[in-house]
Amino acid sequence: MASICTSNFHFLCRKNNSSPISHHLLLSPSSLSFSRCGGLRLCRCAAVKTGSEGGGIRSDNAELLRKPVISTELETTSESEELVKEESDDEVGKKSGDGEGWVDWEDQILEDTVPLVGFVRMILHSGKYAIGDRLSPDHQRTILQRLLPYHPECDKKIGPGVDYITVGYHPDFENSRCLFIVRKDGETVDFSYWKCIKGLIRKNYPLYADSFILRHFRKRRRND
């Protein structure tokens, strides 16, 4: 392989340029070529990159000397995807239990609660039940199994046990209908189905309950 004589190299550079050679001259192997002329070996310099005088080599120039690290980028992408997956599983999961797709938890909560709200409103406001009427066995069973257990004071409301559930006027708000528990000791106790709905959300969706309730539940003036 041809070599460059240091003294000849400096001579050629001084002949072509009176200014001293920058200390930050960067040469790549491909930038040097040789030709023979009359038995003399001459050096031709091309594609020479220099740094600024009095400064170090810029990082972007240093990057030109490096090969693209494709494998590292792929590993980084893989790690990022794994991190996203772990965060999703920890917080909000955003994934269903079987991992087969993303779950919109807000829609899921609405699917679980909107039918119950509609069910109670039908009982209270459709005219199916007059004041003092007992709920049908099916309707009472739905209230006792799917709604009342989520009331924050469920045990206190039930007391010695439920005799039946009826519709009545709220004791504090005129003409406002609500549900009442007639207990086995003969006492009648009202309860808020809205508190039951909120309790259901907090029980089944603890990570999303507060934000969902703030977004979808306005402050109510009636304990209906």
Swiss-Prot record:
Transmembrane segments annotated in the record for this chain: none
Disruption phenotype: Embryonic lethality due to embryo development arrest at globular stage.
Record localization: Plastid, Chloroplast
Entry keyword set: Chloroplast, Plastid, Transit peptide
GO biological process: chloroplast organization; chloroplast rRNA processing
Transit sequence range: 1-50
GO CC terms in record: chloroplast
InterPro entries referenced in this protein's UniProt entry, alphabetically: DCL-like
Bias type Basic and acidic residues, positions: 82-98
Region (Disordered): 76-98
Primary localization class, coarse: plastid
Pfam families reported for this sequence: DUF3223
Function: Has a function in the early stage of chloroplast development and palisade cell morphogenesis. Required for correct plastid ribosome assembly. Required for processing and maturation of 4.5S rRNA.
Protein's name in the database: Protein DCL, chloroplastic
